[in-house]
Amino acid sequence: MGPLLVWHRGDLRLHDHPALLEALARGPVVGLVVLDPNNLKTTPRRRAWFLENVRALREAYRARGGALWVLEGLPWEKVPEAARRLKAKAVYALTSYTPYGRYRDAKVQEALPVPLHLLPAPHLLPPDLPRAYRVYTPFARRFLGVEAPLPAPEALPKGPEEGEIPREDPGLPLPEPGEEAALAGLRAFLEAKLPRYAEERDRLDGEGGSRLSPYFALGVLSPRLAAWEAERRGGEGARKWVAELLWRDFSYHLLYHFPWMAERPLDPRFQALPWQEDEALFRAWYEGRTGVPLVDAAMRELHATGFLSNRARMNAAQFAVKHLLLPWKRCEEAFRHLLLDGDRAVNLQGWQWAGGLGVDAAPYFRVFNPVLQGERHDPEGRWLKRWAPEYPSYAPKDPVVDLEEARRRYLRLARDLARG
């Protein structure tokens, strides 16, 4: 019989990988990545970021003496094909909790000539907790501490290599791909920024945060390892940052238990908001031409870099939903495809939270003032000057809507729906 296949999906790394270590304990392994067309229907920047991290994973296999197969096609065709060609005894992978991941894995299992072993992915809290939580705080109370992460293997058995990894022009500069770069970025954040994270995490320029989200999105960096290292250092910054990592797991938990939240609000009452199918208004928001400085700076930075701070994301999303009443699902999807860290579960949670559509205890009647938000979280205006230099301050300039009138309109509509 041949080797064991380790199928990498949203876990493009060797460290803290239970499926890889379990397979290695049972025999020689060959790694596998399938370039799934269902996941590659996105922007060039996101395809390029994914492909460069697959390339880095192959180099990590090679550096340890191992081999990574890369096949292009549907997983329920290509995983069985790889298993047959290698005469593999079994396939090992980490559990996926997304609706598509569960569908894909069921189809692969049905088509495979050998067993598919799915091991728990190293989340801080498993997304498939039996009780379905809609509010973050009781979910987070289930967290009792971080389990120790697993080490990366020092060596891998030799094996055949198969498949080419295509190149894609991202159209913008990418971060350094691969887990070595991710681990270096983690160390730099823990040493330089974690001590002040609690005070600086809301900066609009994102310089108070880790900027590790593109690595988390592809599983290049294990959140369990990141939380473990943060907790070792301790302090209020570590506590706050681990809480943010728990929000990621809460996002997966929500989508696991409420898969329909990808199509409609978690609170169904707000589906009936009079969404504005206004193409000119959508383009103004999407392209950063609203006349509202914070929103315009946010969308321009996102287009130029593929990154945006959490505070800027919340403001851009809430403005689209509450001030403009743009169809939230269209905006969420367009926004996600610009993000290098575009993660469906995380982005859906973020948009439904910011939009007051039923996630967590965020009240629908909370409406950010983008002028005050800018002045509070970019007090010297440096971020604004970089991304929207035509604005001398955070005061609107010929805005597409009057901020106060739009706020009152939304509150009137939302209150009527909330009262039933």
From Swiss-Prot:
Residues 152-175 are annotated as: Disordered. The record marks W275, W328, W351 as: Electron transfer via tryptophanyl radical. Keywords: Chromophore, DNA damage, DNA repair, DNA-binding, FAD, Flavoprotein, Lyase, Nucleotide-binding, Plasmid. It comes from the Bacteria. InterPro entries: Crypto/Photolyase_FAD-like_sf, Crypto/Photolyase_N_sf, Cryptochr/Photolyase_FAD-bd, Cryptochrome/DNA_photolyase_1, DNA_photolyase_1_CS_C, DNA_photolyase_N, Rossmann-like_a/b/a_fold. It catalyses: cyclobutadipyrimidine (in DNA) = 2 pyrimidine residues (in DNA). DNA binds at R201, Q373. Its cofactor is FAD. Its EC number is 4.1.99.3. GO terms for molecular function: deoxyribodipyrimidine photo-lyase activity; DNA binding; FAD binding. One of its GO terms (biological process) is response to light stimulus. Residues 244-251, 310-311 are annotated as: Interaction with DNA. Residues 159-170 have a biased composition (Basic and acidic residues). Residues 2-124 form the Photolyase/cryptochrome alpha/beta domain. FAD binds at Y197, G209, S210, R211, L212, S213, D341, G342, D343. Binds 1 FAD per subunit. Belongs to the DNA photolyase class-1 family. Monomer. Involved in repair of UV radiation-induced DNA damage. Catalyzes the light-dependent monomerization (300-600 nm) of cyclobutyl pyrimidine dimers (in cis-syn configuration), which are formed between adjacent bases on the same DNA strand upon exposure to ultraviolet radiation. This is Deoxyribodipyrimidine photo-lyase. It comes from Thermus thermophilus (strain ATCC BAA-163 / DSM 7039 / HB27).
